[in-house]
Regions:
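Aromatic-acidic/polar surface patches that form glycan- and anion
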Residues: 12-15, 44-48, 97, 108-111, ...
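Catalytic core and acceptor-binding pocket of nucleotide-sugar-dependent glycosyltransferases
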Residues: 116-196
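A structural signal for short, well-ordered beta-strand segments and their strand-loop junctions
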Residues: 34-36, 67-70, 91, 154-159
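Residue-level detector of short, conserved catalytic/binding motifs and their immediate flanks
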Residues: 3, 104-105, 179
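Hydrophobic beta-strand segments of well-ordered beta-sheets in folded domains
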Residues: 2-5, 87-89, 155
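Short, polar loop motifs at secondary-structure junctions
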Residues: 19-22, 75-80, 161-164
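GT-A fold catalytic core of metal-dependent nucleotide-sugar glycosyltransferases
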Residues: 49-102, 106-116
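N-terminal anchoring/stem segment of glycosyltransferases
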Residues: 1-64, 113, 149-151, 183-196
Length: 196
């Protein structure tokens, strides 16, 4: 069974249009998609920190493997790295950076206790970061939670083609196969907010 692609976004026009483009590209590849619009939590960091709470609600609602895909993304190829039945958690990272953070534009969670545990711990860590007014990104928090877990879920590190940013060059010598392209709408929204 293919995972259900899920996403939530804050409803700006760019995200509304983008999520429909993401949905269309995913459905053309045979994926089902579930999205929700949410109210802004006050900052980009706080909005991103809401991701594990949203994913937890999707786990309870759907009870099947899920893959978060950012609203500003387009799928170009089937997500073949997620078809292994033994993988419980999958995420990418930048191969040219120190291994201190994941890239959370695509996050896979199997329907297993171990993947639910990392999701719960990630949510707790994000809540603490937001309450403490930390500017730590959700992807850094996710990495720290995963690294500290005594018994982490069976993990697949995805190639950078799952989190390829449209205007960034390929990083390192890794095979250059683009599965998901990300358009970084938050950058455009921040620029527009500063200009007004």
């Amino acid at each position: 069974m293919k995972p259900l692609i899920v996403n939530c976004h804050t409803g700006e026009d760019l995200y509304v249009e983008g999520v429909e483009r993401m949905r269309k590209s995913a459905e053309e590849l045979g994926y089902e998609v579930y999205t929700e619009e949410m109210s802004s939590k006050g900052s980009w960091t706080a909005n991103c920190a809401f991701k594990p709470k949203f994913l937890t609600s999707c786990v309870a609602r759907f009870g099947r493997p899920l893959v978060w895909v950012d609203a500003d993304a387009v799928l170009y190829k089937p997500l073949e790295h997620l078809e292994c039945p033994y993988i419980e958690f999958a995420v990418a990272w930048d191969p040219l950076l120190p291994f201190k953070s994941f890239a959370s534009g695509v996050v896979y969670l199997a329907a297993t206790p171990a993947s639910h545990r990392i999701l719960e711990e990630w949510g707790d860590a994000c809540n603490k970061a937001v309450r403490g007014k930390s500017r730590e990104w959700d992807q850094v928090t996710l990495y720290k939670v995963w690294k500290k877990m005594k018994d982490p879920p069976v993990t697949k590190i995805l190639p950078q083609g799952y989190v390829k940013i449209f205007d960034h060059p390929w990083r390192g010598d890794e095979l250059q196969v683009e599965y998901v392209r990300h358009y970084q709408f938050s950058r455009q929204i921040k620029r527009k907010a500063k200009a007004s």
